[in-house]
Amino acid sequence: MTKLKQERGIPMERKNQKSFITTDDRLDKIKLEDASVRDVAEAFYYGNDSYNYNLDVLVSGFFNKSSINKYETNFSKYKHTVLQITMPDFLASLGFQKTGEYNPSHGNKIAKATKESKDIEGIIYQFYDKGLILYNHTQDKNRKLIIEISSWYDKTGYDYSIYCNYDIDNNILLNWENYTKANNPYRGKKIDGSGEILKLNENISFDSIVLPDKMLKIIKDNTLKFFGTTALLSQNNVNLKRGIILSGPPGNGKTMICKALANEVNVSVLYVLPSNLQQTTDVNRIYEMAIELSPCLLIIEDIDFMTMDRDNFSGDGRLIELMNKLDGIEEMNGVITLATTNLVDKVETAIKNRPGRFDRVINIPLPDIDLRIEMFKKFLNNADVDYEVVAEKAEKLSGAYIKEICQTAKLLAIVNGDIDSNNLAIVNDDYLLEAITEMSDKDFSQAKKYIPKNKIGFEVSRIER
């Protein structure tokens, strides 16, 4: 055996085993006669990594069912996916190598393993990627981890199996949580509030947004440049969490800014919609995700739906929870909360313009004539039209409306046969003015009946004629 171990590079001294692994009689349970296979067993026993057993994973009775189900229920798809991805790797990092089988044809899905010629099976309650199966024993009351190295052929052609048992440590779930903090597969990814990968339009960038340069600089300084200088900020005792509110009428580019930032930042992005924050516990869940994924840009659209002024609102536990999170009761270094609202005057005063919560409120007003000219040029690819005239006619219209006017003008050109040799619409002043008149006389005037005067520019669906 010594010679074989030396030939295969197996260390003479046993490596330190994990405290929750029992190994006293491990080799005695391996009934193998052939030296080469026994040597494989010793390599496995001493933790040698030079052998690739190509095993699946079967965990038997690893957690009690209630604890793991409660854990996943509290964290929705996000934690479920993190568990799927990290648990097999976590076990492998501890030296666990396991195999078994499961029978999906059975109504309850039965997992099976073999322990010293005794079949063990249990009802599966979780089945994960990479072959990880969690189930409860039905025939063996001891909480054991069954390890089987199957289909190992020695040079004589015989098939051997190696069986070993581990006692399970009660703290292993906590150890796994610590493991995921360093190996979270979502870190650096762009996800939504339920843990799904975002499908962002990669063409949206700050180059596609028409806003005053000064305003864009403020936004970039508090987001892109902030994430790029965290080490320097920390050295100078600058708070490494930020809260920013983008306010203004609908259609003025708030969501476009959020999407551009999501595309351009090189950190994790968590994009949250009102549907992701229905309960107080959802606020806590979202911020736990952001902290785990930090550095992270947390985008919350339409934050006014849960932060209404308490003088005019009966109260909402979500508001209190949000204030607690922003106050930094928990460490939130590296988390920027970027929120949007069309109704900033309705947002609770204790939230907005409050250092430590939302430090900046950036108002994005309706575009002035210079910005409207720039928008028309951008949306029309510098077509030969009188931009000052059409921009004046589009007074008090948002960027979204101006874009719609340009789309309508192109449609009018196409249906009238005004296209160039490259099949591109030839837009002229008449088409633009007709589009503006069509919108102003019908859709826009109808919209103004149902919205406050200070919300002119509110986006409404085009009225069918």
Language model feature labels by segment:
Residues 62, 175, 179, 222, ...:
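Residues that form generic nucleotide/phosphate-binding pockets
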Residues 206-392:
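Walker A/P-loop NTP-binding motif of AAA+ ATPase domains
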Residues 185, 228-231, 295, 327, ...:
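Generic structural signal for secondary-structure transition and capping sites
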Residues 169-176, 257, 375, 405:
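Hydrophobic side chains in well-ordered alpha-helices
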Residues 354, 365, 369-465:
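C-terminal alpha-helical "lid" subdomain
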Residues 2-228, 460-465:
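AAA+ P-loop ATPase mechanoenzymes
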Residues 49-52, 56, 293, 396, ...:
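Residues at alpha-helix boundaries and the short loops/turns that link adjacent helices
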